[in-house]
């Protein structure tokens, strides 16, 4: 492996770019050189036969196109990872994991938040397993993951049932055109904007259930607190079944143009 002279904790820029003979990388074995904390831009780009890598639990940073167009089909995201940078490829801004054949991602126990743009443009991604510890899906995490159709929490979690996620930020699932159903339980906020719709472009989405959260003060008064943001599900014409429960606010045009709201109104009273 190649390391930076100063810290010896970085797999350097383009270190193994287009090394087509590379098949497996075990970062844990590199600790004699220092804790591998950074995989730099294009470090493994074009390693089309790289099918196995162990992302060390010391890893904190993955930079642009680090694993672009590799043979990886499955990875586990360590809880130590705190930074991912996107980069431009083929005229689009994509995550370091795009351009290849990555089909399954598992987030390790202890991960509390996905990172912005983490798998953006990874069009091969089909399945994501989240830990119960994960509370926030950040902006554009799975944007344009057009093959994503299965989400679960834990090994025994129900398919497309997210019951521990509290916040979903703008664009998180925008362009996930293979996702057909989604159940959100105990969600406090679905952030969204008309220019970056959280579930925009989910053209196969047929059924959505959202159960909000309530808070109870010391007098016993219960208050609704969940908000569904502007244009969150707008123009998903296949979406014909929407179940909402204990929702405080459905923002402007949240469901406009969906199959159940062709007149342009928001189905805020649907339960």
Residues covered by each model-derived region:
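Structural signature of tandem-repeat unit edges
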Residues: 1-10, 20-38, 48-61, 70-83, ...
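Consensus positions within tandem repeat domains that build extended binding/scaffold surfaces
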Residues: 12-17, 40-43, 63-66, 95-97, ...
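A structural signal for leucine-rich repeat
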Residues: 89-92, 119-120, 160-161, 199
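Short, flexible coil/linker elements and helix-boundary hinge sites characteristic
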Residues: 91-95, 219-221
């Amino acid at each position: 492996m190649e390391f930076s002279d100063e810290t010896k904790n970085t797999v350097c820029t383009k270190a193994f770019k287009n090394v087509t003979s590379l098949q497996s990388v075990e970062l844990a074995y590199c600790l004699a050189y220092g804790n591998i904390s950074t995989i730099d831009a294009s470090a493994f780009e074009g390693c089309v036969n790289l099918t196995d890598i162990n992302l060390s639990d010391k890893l904190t940073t993955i930079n642009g196109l680090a694993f672009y167009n590799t043979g990886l089909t499955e990875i586990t995201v360590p809880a130590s990872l705190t930074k991912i940078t996107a980069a431009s490829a083929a005229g689009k801004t994509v995550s370091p994991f795009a351009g290849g054949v990555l089909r399954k991602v598992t987030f390790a126990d202890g991960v509390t938040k996905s990172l912005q743009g983490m798998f953006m443009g990874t069009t091969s991604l089909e399945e994501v397993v989240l830990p119960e510890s994960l509370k926030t899906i950040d902006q554009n995490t799975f944007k344009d993951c057009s093959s994503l159709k299965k989400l679960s929490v834990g090994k025994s979690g129900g398919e497309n049932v997210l019951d521990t996620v509290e916040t979903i930020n703008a664009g998180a699932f925008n362009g996930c055109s293979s996702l057909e159903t989604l159940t959100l339980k105990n969600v406090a906020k679905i952030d969204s904007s008309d220019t970056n719709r959280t579930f925009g472009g989910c053209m196969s989405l047929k059924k959505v259930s959202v159960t909000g959260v309530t808070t109870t003060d010391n007098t016993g008064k219960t208050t609704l607190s969940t908000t569904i943001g502007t244009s969150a599900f707008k123009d998903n014409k296949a979406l014909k079944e929407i179940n909402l429960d204990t929702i405080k606010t459905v923002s402007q045009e949240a469901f406009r143009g969906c199959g159940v709201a062709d007149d342009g109104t928001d189905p805020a009273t649907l339960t």
